[in-house]
């Protein structure tokens, strides 16, 4: 079976997957796996082409905060894998909580397998470099305005060759960008933005996101970042590889979401420690909200000739710690060494840019019940917020709602295209809200925004009624 994922093929991929296939055979699973890597920046375009042309493959990765599985379902691209999960998914059902697995269903049928690798209530925090705060005699910011003024001071005093810009792949979706950090400071919180276009609060109110006061506040904050020189001037054309390179080089001060490791920090500050990256929440006393029940998963394309084999492979990964370690960390003694029950030490290869020759992806098919941590190199506060369940967190009432745009197919396609051209530059702060938004909104209305929002509201109200809300 062929498993398609975003990313770059590790140097020792073939060696590791030979071992994986040998173990699959020894365990009698009856599956042989080939993993196909597509560069991240070409992912959407290439995957959509593969799906539309019916190319032969059997499993592909889903990023819910980028393109949710419902989007593929609505194109008729996903296979119903309910039967395969019931028959071959015992380990999946055992290790993925019911409320998360329920988020992978449409009309009671399974169309994806969630990756239970992260606590989704982590959405809304950001990382800050405490070593840089200390070097500049600064306190940790507690408001968006304090964040900007702190960042300005750091930028002015920065001695590195590359400035610690705000860098990301441009969008207008606060969940994808993690600009949801701002939302905790608004009186209307808790709310989330679902499927890029729809504001949903815990009372069940649905609005057009770009027409809310909250969108305007976000855009005005981003405009300040941009005009004060804190945002990368090339923000609208940045590629994911460029964003990653900045983090890997240690040339950053603030990252929305979680990032960093000791080795990357020390490229910028050789004296840095793992405690020099802190997790910050604005208004930490407020509720912690999961916008989605899961962030990543894997789905079987409708044209797959091996749907059961795909489920068997995912189930096998969670059959033992040995299987999981092989898939995620590679060959023990060559790519990593165990460090206690849940620890591991990466073996960096000087002939591979001082990185291990193999590393899997726990965002693609990881599970918190099996994950190992680099106890010397990983960031303790990030580990806690990402990989420990938050017992006080609540799910957004829209977390498991799936929108079907069939009735507004043309309008939905049009607003997606128009928003990329007209809304993203405003949300990223490159254009001024008061000056440019009226014309952009007019274009969105002409593209069919009102009709799409009305259909979303109708379906969400029906969903709420079925939930007994």
Predicted regions and their residues:
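Extracytoplasmic/secretory soluble proteins
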Residues: 1-469
């Amino acid at each position: 079976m062929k498993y398609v994922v975003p990313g770059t093929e590790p140097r020792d991929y073939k060696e590791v997957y030979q071992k994986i296939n040998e173990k699959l055979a020894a365990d009698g699973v009856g599956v042989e796996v080939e993993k196909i890597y597509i560069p991240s920046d070409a992912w959407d375009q290439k995957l959509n082409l593969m799906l539309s042309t019916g190319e032969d493959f059997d499993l592909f990765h889903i990023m819910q905060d980028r393109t949710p599985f419902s989007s593929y379902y609505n194109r008729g691209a996903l296979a119903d894998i309910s039967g395969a999960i019931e028959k071959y998914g015992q380990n999946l059902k055992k290790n993925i909580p019911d409320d998360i697995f329920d988020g992978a269903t449409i009309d009671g049928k399974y169309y994806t397998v969630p990756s239970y690798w992260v606590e989704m209530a982590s959405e809304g925090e950001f990382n800050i470099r405490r070593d840089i705060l200390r070097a500049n005699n600064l306190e940790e910011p507690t408001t968006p305005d304090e964040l900007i003024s702190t960042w300005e001071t750091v930028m002015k005093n920065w001695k590195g060759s590359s400035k610690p810009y705000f860098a990301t792949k441009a969008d207008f979706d606060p969940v994808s960008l993690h600009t949801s950090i701002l939302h905790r400071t608004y009186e209307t919180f808790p709310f989330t933005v679902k499927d890029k276009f729809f504001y949903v609060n815990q009372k069940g109110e649905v609005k057009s996101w770009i027409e809310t006061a909250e969108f305007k506040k976000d855009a005005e904050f981003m405009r300040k970042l941009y005009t004060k020189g804190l945002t990368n001037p090339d923000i609208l054309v940045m590629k994911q590889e460029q964003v990653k390179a900045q983090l890997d080089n240690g040339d950053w001060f603030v990252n929305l979401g979680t990032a960093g490791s000791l080795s990357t920090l020390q490229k910028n500050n050789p004296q840095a420690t793992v405690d020099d990256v802190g997790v910050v929440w604005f208004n930490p006393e407020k509720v912690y909200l999961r916008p989605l029940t899961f962030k990543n998963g894997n789905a079987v394309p409708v044209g797959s000739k091996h749907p059961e084999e795909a489920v068997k492979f995912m189930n096998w990964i969670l059959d033992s710690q040995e299987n999981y370690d092989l898939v995620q960390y590679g060959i023990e003694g060559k790519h990593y060494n165990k460090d206690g029950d849940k620890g591991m030490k990466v073996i960096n290869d000087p002939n591979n840019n001082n990185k291990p020759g193999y590393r899997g992806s726990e965002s693609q098919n990881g599970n918190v019940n099996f994950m190992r941590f680099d106890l010397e190199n990983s960031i303790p506060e990030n580990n806690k917020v990402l990989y420990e369940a938050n017992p006080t967190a609540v799910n957004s009432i829209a977390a498991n709602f799936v929108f079907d745009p069939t009735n507004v197919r043309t309008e939905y396609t049009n607003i997606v295209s128009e928003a990329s051209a007209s809304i993203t530059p405003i949300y990223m702060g490159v254009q001024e809200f008061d000056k440019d938004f009226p014309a952009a909104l007019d274009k969105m209305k002409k593209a069919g925004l009102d009709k799409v929002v009305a259909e979303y509201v109708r379906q969400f109200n029906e969903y709420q009624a079925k939930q007994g809300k």
